[in-house]
């Protein structure tokens, strides 16, 4: 009954077994599940199960003191991880690629500007919205920038020039945020010698940035 909507691309043995499990759960009539639940089970269930098992094996084999699950994307992983391995001592922590980008701006200004502004040009957001997302609008509100105009390939270079003209002040703003993050993570990592961070992003920039901050800046 449910096979046309079941995931493919797996080996015949694993695919058949997983489709059978999904069909038995979703089509037995005992309970009606939401579409969001069905989608998560079908498209992410097997991945999450395998990923959590990999994380746990890695933590044991490398004698990890604490596993960190980053906010938002890591929430469901943390919940499944706790179901599979209760009392594991892992932590769900506040962290994001945006926060990492701002707190490591001093390391690579070009990368900061590229990801914070250049990649957003042509998406429909205004110059003001771009500055607000970077926590920089109060610093530049008196500058002659086209705040109400959509961010595009032309005005993004004007924005870059303005930011470069006040770069030390930009870094000072982010240094204050970094100090707050330092206090937060000091409590999270207290007593730990080896920590593993779980980052869903394909680049892994969140985990790499946190490692750099913890080992070199904090």
Task: Please identify what each model-predicted range represents.
Residues 31-47, 161-176:
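Glycine-rich phosphate-binding "P-loop"
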Residues 47-61, 177-188:
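A short, well-structured juxtamembrane/interface segment
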Residues 2-44, 79, 83-139:
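Extended charged low-complexity segments that act as oligomerization/scaffolding linkers
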Residues 1, 72-73, 95-98, 200-203:
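An acidic- and aromatic-residue-enriched active-site/binding cleft used to recognize and process polar
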Residues 60-61, 79-91, 190, 209-218:
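Short, surface-exposed basic-aromatic patches at helix termini and helix-loop junctions that form
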Residues 64-71, 195-198:
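Short glycine-rich phosphate-binding loop at a beta-alpha junction
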Residues 1, 143-218:
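PRPP/pyrophosphate-binding module of the type I phosphoribosyltransferase fold
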């Amino acid at each position: 009954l449910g096979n046309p909507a079941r995931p493919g691309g797996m080996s015949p043995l694993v695919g058949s077994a997983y489709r059978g499990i999904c069909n038995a759960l979703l089509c037995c009539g005992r309970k009606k599940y939401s579409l969001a639940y069905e989608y998560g089970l079908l498209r992410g269930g097997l991945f999450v199960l395998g990923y959590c098992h990999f994380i746990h094996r890695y933590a044991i084999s490398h004698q990890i003191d604490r596993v960190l699950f980053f906010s938002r994307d890591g929430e469901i992983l943390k919940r499944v991880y706790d179901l599979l391995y209760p009392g594991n001592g892992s932590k769900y922590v506040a962290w994001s690629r945006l926060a990492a980008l701002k707190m490591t701006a001093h390391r690579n200004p070009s990368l900061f500007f590229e990801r914070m502004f250049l990649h957003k040009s042509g998406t429909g957001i205004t110059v003001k919205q771009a500055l607000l997302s970077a926590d920089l609008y109060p610093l530049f509100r008196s500058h002659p920038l086209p705040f109400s105009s959509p961010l595009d390939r032309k005005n993004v270079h004007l924005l870059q020039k303005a930011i470069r003209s006040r770069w030390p002040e930009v870094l000072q703003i982010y240094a204050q945020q970094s100090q707050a993050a330092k206090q937060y993570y000091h409590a999270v990592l207290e007593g730990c010698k080896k920590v593993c961070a779980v980052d869903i992003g394909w680049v892994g920039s969140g985990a790499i940035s946190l490692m750099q901050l913890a080992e070199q800046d904090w």
